[in-house]
Amino acid sequence: MGYSPPSPFKNVVEQQELQLQEPVSSRRLTGPVQFILGLLDCWKLEKKDAVYLLGFDETQSTCISEVFKGNEQLLGWDAKDRLSHLFAIRESLHYFFRDLETENDWLREPQPLLDGQIPMDLLLKGSIVDILLVREYIESMVGR
């Protein structure tokens, strides 16, 4: 049996529940919503950043708030595709760095092979093309 690294999101859901304005049972939150809340925590982002990561525009921030409260579900193939890519990015970064602080530093530093762009800036632009660019770059770093 091979080595299995610890989960990059251990206990994140419980931590996020404490930070929500009103208590939400994790049973009411779908897996994708739990994942995005965990990702925001890991990457030290605010809930408003989820709007861009998921491909919504600013006018839909109320909808995202309702999703985080468990009152609405995250619908649409685009958002689910983005979640899939974000999961792959997070998984590859965790595999490569094994340290959340180093991972966060890397995400916020200009990367020469991305033409000096900052990966987090690309992710927060809201473009699926930019998310894919960051994913491909990170996966090439880890040899996937």
Cite the ranges covered by each PLM segment.
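Non-transmembrane "mature" sequence context
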Residues: 1-144
